[in-house]
From Swiss-Prot:
Protein name per UniProt: Glutathione synthetase
GO MF terms, alphabetically ordered: ATP binding; glutathione synthase activity; metal ion binding
Organism for this UniProt entry: Escherichia coli O127:H6 (strain E2348/69 / EPEC)
Catalysis: reaction(s): gamma-L-glutamyl-L-cysteine + glycine + ATP = glutathione + ADP + phosphate + H(+)
InterPro entries: ATP-grasp, ATP_grasp_subdomain_1, Glut_synth_pro, GSHS_ATP-bd, GSHS_N, PreATP-grasp_dom_sf
Any Pfam family matching the protein: GSH-S_N
Cofactor(s) demanded: Mg(2+); Mn(2+)
Cofactor binding remark: Binds 1 magnesium or manganese ion per subunit.
NCBIfam families reported in the protein's UniProt record: glut_syn, PRK05246.1
PROSITE patterns (alphabetical): ATP_GRASP
GO CC annotation: cytoplasm
EC number(s) stated in the UniProt entry for this protein: 6.3.2.3
Binding site for Mg(2+): 281, 283
UniProt keyword annotations, A-Z: ATP-binding, Glutathione biosynthesis, Glycoprotein, Ligase, Magnesium, Manganese, Metal-binding, Nucleotide-binding
Length: 316
């Protein structure tokens, strides 16, 4: 029997209608896996050994009672076959410390989804630089004068921090906007932090598409997140409306071009953000949108994921 651990935010507070981690647990349970639940505070290192307090649990699609803890133990993480790292951003130093603990278990043979080193290496905004032929024009800088020159060249740009999620602190600066200076100062904290500028993509009106990639294989359907009421952000957390759709030809092309790199880096479950035919982000920490897509189309994304995990475990 496969022992699957999950590190996540408190399960008591999730919305099971749209929580991807919960969907993964349901599928793992359906396959007869033993489920071990952990929060960040449960992980620890003792003399170089990664351990955790884990709680075995059962889950069910029930809005009143969706989980039950069935036992508690303290064990070496190496006792688990696979661990899903599903802690939501912020990607801060605490998150990084947790990846080091998980890496100690990985060295003992536990499969970590996603690979701890790659979680550290692949910033969700900056990792797109390795695929610059697929992205909008992109500038990463702390320098206000460079941001101003980029804005003057494109006259309509998006500015964002490198560590935001859910659309937080994303600004659109149009031609003639008097606020560029203060936005640049705010995002760079007066030239002490990097931020990202990209040319505005009018295709955002048709949605910011979340394309999921499972061990290098694109899921054939995506979730387009469509901005509402004059917003420029499609993020569901910013009030965007989700619309599941089949992938377009350009979606396939982008996902297939990036897929082999993701697989090679041990990034087994990844969410690409695509606007029109341009790649804007590569989400590796805790991608979501499984439930919205599965509700609309005949696809089991969690099934694809567990198949990929089982295939990797057999190769070990």
């Amino acid at each position: 029997m496969i022992k699957l651990g999950i590190v996540m935010d408190p399960i008591a507070n999730i919305n099971i209608k749209k929580d991807s981690s919960f969907a993964m647990l349901l599928e793992a349970q359906r396959r007869g896996y033993e489920l071990h639940y952990m929060e960040m505070a449960d992980l620890y290192l003792i003399n170089g050994e990664a351990r955790a307090r884990t709680r075995t649990l059962s889950v069910e699609q029930n809005y009143d009672k969706w989980y039950e803890f069935t036992g508690e133990q303290d064990l070496p993480l190496a006792d688990l076959d696979v661990i899903l790292m599903r802690k939501d951003p912020p990607f801060d130093t605490e998150f990084i410390y947790a990846t080091y603990i998980l890496e100690r278990a990985e060295e003992k043979g536990t499969l970590i989804v996603n690979k701890p080193q790659s979680l550290r290496d692949c910033n969700e905004k900056l990792f797109t630089a390795w695929f610059s032929d697929l992205t909008p024009e992109t500038l990463v800088t702390r320098n206000k004068a460079q941001l101003k020159a980029f804005w003057e060249k494109h006259s309509d740009i998006i500015l964002k921090p490198l560590d935001g999620m859910g659309g937080a602190s994303i600004f659109r600066v149009k031609e003639g906007d008097p606020n560029l200076g203060v936005i640049a100062e705010t995002l760079t904290e007066h030239g002490t932090r990097y931020c990202m500028a990209q040319n505005y993509l009018p295709a955002i009106k048709d949605g910011d598409k979340r394309v999921l990639v499972v061990d290098g294989e694109p899921v054939p359907y995506c979730l387009a997140r469509i901005p509402q009421g004059g917003e420029t952000r499609g993020n569901l957390a910013a009030g965007g409306r989700g619309e599941p759709r089949p992938l377009t030809e350009s979606d396939w092309k982008i996902a297939r071009q990036i897929g082999p790199t993701l697989k090679e880096k041990g990034l087994i479950f990844v969410g690409l953000d695509i606007i029109g035919d341009r790649l804007t982000e590569i989400n590796v920490t805790s991608p979501t949108c499984i439930r919205e897509i599965e509700a609309e189309f005949p696809v089991s994304i969690t099934g694809m994921l567990m198949d990929a995990i089982e295939a990797r475990l057999q190769q070990q």
